[in-house]
Amino acid sequence: MPFTLGQRWISDTESELGLGTVVAMDARTVTLLFPSTGENRLYARSDSPVTRVMFNPGDTITSHEGWQLHIDEVKEENGLLVYVGTRLDTEETNVTLREVLLDSKLVFSKPQDRLFAGQIDRMDRFALRYRARKFQSEQYRMPYSGLRGQRTNLIPHQLNIAHDVGRRHAPRVLLADEVGLGKTIEAGMILHQQLLSGAAERVLIIVPETLQHQWLVEMLRRFNLRFALFDDERYTEAQHDAYNPFETEQLVICSLDFARRNKQRLEHLCDAEWDLLVVDEAHHLVWSTDAPSREYMAIEQLAERVPGVLLLTATPEQLGMESHFARLRLLDPNRFHDFEQFVEEQKNYRPVADAVAMLLAGNKLSNDELNRLGDLIGEQDIEPLLQAANSDRDDAQAARDELVSMLMDRHGTSRVLFRNTRNGVKGFPKRELHTVKLPLPTQYQTAIKVSGIMGARKSPEDRARDMLYPEQIYQEFEGDTGTWWNFDPRVEWLMGYLTSHRSQKVLVICAKATTALQLEQVLREREGIRAAVFHEGMSIIERDRAAAWFAEEDTGAQVLLCSEIGSEGRNFQFASNLVMFDLPFNPDLLEQRIGRLDRIGQAHDIQIHVPYLEKTAQSVLVRWYHEGLDAFEHTCPTGRAIYDSAYASLINYLAAPEETDGFDDLIKSCREQHEALKAQLEQGRDRLLEIHSNGGEKAQQLAQSIEEQDDDTNLIAFAMNLFDIVGINQDDRGDNLIVLTPSDHMLVPDFPGLPEDGCTITFERDVALSREDAQFITWEHPLIRNGLDLILSGDTGSSTISLLKNKALPVGTLLVELVYVVEAQAPKQLQLNRFLPPTPVRMLLDKNGNNLAAQVEFETFNRQLSAVNRHTGSKLVNAVQQDVHAILQLGETQIEKSARALIDNARREADEKLSGELSRLEALRAVNPNIRDDELAAIDSNRQQVLESLNQAGWRLDALRLIVVTHQ
């Protein structure tokens, strides 16, 4: 190679060194100094892995002093290049810059610059980059983006609500599904969509203290959303890092009590500029016109400041119209400002609901009924629709569906309230109760007696709680020497049940973690029963491992022993046997226990076993739950209301279980209350609201589309290719499980989302649902999204050279494969990717500018090519540099037409969609006041900004491949 002192070269193997300068040479070697790092390299002159850096007219270069020059001419003087051009900061022309004075920190970012500088990538990285562009663009365009990545069953009614609400601007809704229908999952899906699309970035979740960990686990395990849990300690700690501690995290969970207890803390919460607020158990927010509770006022303050609000409640409005109004008032105080007016409005919706029921029944409509429909939808000419709906024509059903849809839009709260009931959703198992009455051991009798004497001053409530757990009373007196499990008949019964059902998985729930730990030891030591333990003292990872061991079919644990708090947020649908070693204090917790197994998707009827000790609070409670509320074998939406009204009497019976006088009357009274409330609920069921919330056929199709996407083999092939190239080890463990671990030769030292000790992944939804230790990989999983960002945000694979062995073409024929990206820059919240995601346009040009891309498919072509090592590649590039420049110019002239077509289509689509949405809502505003002014204004503003951003869209060269034909 001809070297001259002062020339600038770049290392082919260590491009991070920057620009090198020739500082010494002899007959056989040359020395380069790399000023940006201060390092020297000695190379052999004859075959050194370095490439001469030469810029061309039209390029912009930077001097070592920092000013830039636009090159007009390149001269050569004594083997050194001199660049002549216009200085950009002073606009001075005919400025010269000798190559020795170039900035040494020069980074080649354009694909063509990297190619000419010898920074040539491996061929497989170029292919990965193109696939990443192609798949990313396709994923952005998916109509159900944000709904596929969660570790959940594809349940239509949940998907329907999430799809509807998740795409709105700053959604403000009340999710009021019955227990077990998955409100938490619906809220998670909405959050996931809003965060993924950029519509929201900061989220605050406020829940009762006992549910904090459940939400933390659900958000992480199901949606890969890592929330920070704020309590007093975390708040104090964060005060050292920021004036407002809540600004130290983007995603926060805290308890309602934590939020309202301290005035300054509440102010900090209100000032933290959240995009979305989620409030669980919103029925605990007590409100009346005269005296709203402190909790209610705290949430009201937040709801006034946060644009998006999701309230979750399981209590139907029929059990308290005033509290129902209060929750709607939090969502839209302008719309729901007068309780009396609200009650009157609700009565007026009856005819709408009747009309829908009439249409759904499918019977011929009378003239009166047709007239009533005409009156209800009076502002539009629906005569043709009415005629079609009442005919025997093929389009009769479609006409009825459209009329139902029109009526839905007019329904008072259909945009702010969603409620599904078990009656309207299919797929739930039966629940069968098996009670086992056992004698009270003398040791417990003595302990209870002594406790009664010593605790005479205790409140009835405290005594009742003690009496529920006699083993705890006994242990308190006996201390560490107490071995209650040696005589407690429940332990003997449990061992007998487990040994006679060895092939079945059994979930055992008890109130305390200590009870679970002691039972595990007894089962293991006495009967050799494999039992996993699950309690609040364990980390999330430890609980995952326990859950995974329980889930394993052949070698896994037969039984999982859970404490009350430890089991929150976990579902074990693969098991159908539940043992309640003791009973919880209220019906909500009882339903939560059964809900661990009683979910949509449970394949078997649930067997609920309750071994209880006679003459204890357990015997009182088992009767009250079963005979008074029917809470074991059916969900009990009335449970909390009856529990609150019967609380004082019930506590007395629990505190003194031997006093049974009047208990039968209490049970009878509660049963009558339960039946009356249940009938009231059934009668007041809002069929229209249920139809709207359920989604019908549309929701079924959505679930089916996502299921088909689950079978996409492109994802598996791409992910494995990505892991290979990034340098992540893959170990196939069978059963559709793969273990990923970091290697020593990764593209980046720490791959975002991959733990240091690795992780287990699966591409199968069913496997992910039964194996909580396995991460469910979809296009929306952080591992894949981070991988796409890693490849596409840098220059990995942006320039390469390949050989094409093809005797039909002359040796040395040049082809250049160009990948342009058409894109628009805009704030993330505009969600521009719906219309114009970064879209790759591939060209395959010969030296005459003929584009062969349409005739030569990428993957087929890629398989015909072979790689070239970097050193040989650099020589090839230098030999054909002028030809490549000419082909690049031809590419620049051709891309404009394709790019303009893409941009024009995106503009048309955006205008049609956003204008159509705005027009529809403006028309509905006349008949449904629940459409907020700020929502209409936001859609209009969004439309204008989107169209303006699309006007500014452009294109750039993202990657190129030089192909040289050979016959060898």
Curated annotation (Swiss-Prot):
Q: Which PROSITE patterns match?
A: HELICASE_ATP_BIND_1 (PS51192), HELICASE_CTER (PS51194)
Enzyme Commission identifier(s): 3.6.4.-
What is this protein's name? RNA polymerase-associated protein RapA
Q: Does the keyword section mention Ubl conjugation? A: no
Q: What class of enzyme is it?
A: hydrolase
Q: Kindly indicate whether the keyword DNA-binding belongs to this entry.
A: yes
Q: How does it assemble?
A: Interacts with the RNAP. Has a higher affinity for the core RNAP than for the holoenzyme. Its ATPase activity is stimulated by binding to RNAP.
One Pfam family from the record: Helicase_C
Q: Where is the Helicase C-terminal domain?
A: 490-685
Function description: Transcription regulator that activates transcription by stimulating RNA polymerase (RNAP) recycling in case of stress conditions such as supercoiled DNA or high salt concentrations. Probably acts by releasing the RNAP, when it is trapped or immobilized on tightly supercoiled DNA. Does not activate transcription on linear DNA. Probably not involved in DNA repair.
Assigned protein family:
Belongs to the SNF2/RAD54 helicase family. RapA subfamily.
- Organism per entry: Salmonella typhimurium (strain LT2 / SGSC1412 / ATCC 700720)
Binding positions (ATP):
177-184
- An annotated Gene Ontology molecular function: ATP binding
Q: What are the UniProt keywords, alphabetically?
A: Activator, ATP-binding, DNA-binding, Helicase, Hydrolase, Nucleotide-binding, Transcription, Transcription regulation
